Amino acid sequence: KADLLVANNVLAHVPEIVDFATGCGSLLSQDGVATFEFPHLVDLIASAQFDTIYHEHFSYLSLLATEAVLKSAGMHVFDAERIPTHGGSLRAFAQRTDAGSRLEEPGLHEIRRLEESLGVASSDFYSGFQNRADRISHDLSRFLLDAECNGEMVVAYGAAAKGNTLLNFAGVRQDLVQWVADRNPAKVGMFLPGSRIPIVDESEVR
């Protein structure tokens, strides 16, 4: 059995999240700790991080939702912290409910109070998200169109899922972004899905 189980940016990718969490709990020793790190729903909504929303992600988690998932899986969250990864993530620390050897930490209570005060469990918390996302899309398109009108060449670095989500949402094509550079040889020579922007080796940037 494991004394420490680390699952960074895994939960959001799992379609059967309670089943997965149950499996994690079964791997822990009696006093073992599991840590789960994932993009924090509070930051996703507050900053209109729509580029985090794509086909690989099945869940977008708050602390309150994570506590409910882990409770259903026979685990208990005893601590949590907010971290800056991916524009704002949450790292939760959990133990088996039959362990009961760790008290809840103040950081957990603080994040729980934050989410309750923001009303993450109500639909009002999510109102305005679409408008904020549309504004980001509009501003990006305006920037690229202005650059084109000024005779400037725009390229991108990193053929990642988030960037691809942003470009497709804004309707950006090769006429506005000529190419995207990436160091992954498996991507070089390919095209971004949807936008069809070619991917070149990062040496092109130098």
Language model segments and positions:
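A conserved beta-strand element that flanks and buttresses the S-adenosyl-L-methionine
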Residues: 3-6
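Short catalytic micro-motifs in class I SAM-dependent methyltransferases
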Residues: 8-10
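A short glycine-rich, Lys/Arg-flanked "PGG" loop and its adjoining helix->strand segment in the class I
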Residues: 18-33
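Short, glycine-/aromatic-enriched active-site segment of Class I SAM-dependent methyltransferases
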Residues: 36-59, 63-66, 70
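Conserved S-adenosyl-L-methionine
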Residues: 75-86
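Flexible, glycine-/basic-rich loop-and-beta segments that form/coincide
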Residues: 86-132
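A short, well-structured juxtamembrane/interface segment
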Residues: 132-150
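A solvent-exposed beta-alpha-beta segment
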Residues: 145-206
